[in-house]
């Protein structure tokens, strides 16, 4: 199921106005997947605010709380969408005090164990059998902050136990079906979230999986 409009405001002077947003900053947050009425849908779950509707939650990182680094020179990082040495703004896969700690989750009873069937996922980034819930990026919209111009890019990645970069999603080469990650049923995982420019981002995700028993793909 398509889950629209997960919103991010990155390094704006003030949070965006003109909408009924619940502004979330400086805490642990998950985009939570839940199984309701035969379909998958998403919501925001924040440690302080609790459950927040996905289209009213704004994850905000202002000038004080924003992490940025210079893009490394290695071609490994080309997927970020900026040249070597240029800044990339990101939220870490590790819990860094003062910054948003964002992940995906289907734990806490939102997807009871046994809801989804195990299957072998052949994507080389996974290559395992489990009751997978697939998370696919389907669209991104960007509104520039004052002083910014041009296109912006988003990326999602992890670093594995061998120190290798695992790219899950990147808009710099276009959005395709390969812009996806997988979460084990009732699981929880954190990622590095990268943004190339200051401004307001909206990301659309589709959640899918095979139901246990019928193997129906939803």
Residue ranges of predicted features:
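Bacterial N-terminal signal peptides that target proteins for export
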Residues: 1-6
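Cleavable N-terminal signal peptides of Sec/SRP-targeted secreted and luminal proteins
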Residues: 9-11
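N-terminal signal peptide c-region/cleavage motif recognized by signal peptidases
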Residues: 13-15
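Phosphate/adenylate-binding glycine loop and adjacent helical scaffold
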Residues: 21-187, 216-218
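Short tyrosine-centred short linear motifs in exposed loops/low-complexity segments
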Residues: 189, 197-201
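Short, solvent-exposed loop/turn segments at the edges of extracellular beta-sandwich modules
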Residues: 210-214
């Amino acid at each position: 199921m398509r889950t629209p409009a997960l919103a991010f405001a990155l390094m704006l002077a003030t949070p965006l106005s003109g909408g009924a947003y619940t502004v979330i900053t400086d805490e642990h947050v998950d985009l939570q997947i839940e199984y309701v009425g035969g379909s998958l849908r998403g919501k925001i779950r924040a440690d302080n605010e609790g459950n927040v509707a996905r289209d009213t939650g704004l994850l905000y990182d202002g000038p004080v709380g924003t992490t940025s680094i210079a893009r490394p020179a290695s071609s490994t990082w080309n997927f970020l969408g900026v040249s070597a040495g240029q800044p990339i703004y990101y939220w870490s896969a590790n819990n860094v005090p003062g910054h948003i700690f964002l992940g995906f989750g289907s734990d806490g009873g939102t997807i009871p164990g046994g809801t989804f069937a195990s299957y072998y996922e052949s994507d080389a980034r996974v290559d395992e059998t489990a009751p997978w819930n697939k998370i696919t990026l389907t669209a991104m919209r960007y509104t520039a902050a004052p002083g910014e111009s041009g296109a912006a890019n988003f990326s999602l990645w992890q670093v594995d136990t061998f120190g290798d970069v695992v790219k899950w999603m990147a808009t710099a080469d276009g959005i395709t079906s390969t812009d996806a990650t997988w979460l084990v049923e009732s699981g929880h995982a954190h990622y590095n979230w990268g943004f190339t420019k200051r401004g307001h981002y909206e990301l659309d995700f589709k959640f899918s999986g095979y139901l246990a028993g019928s193997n129906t793909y939803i």
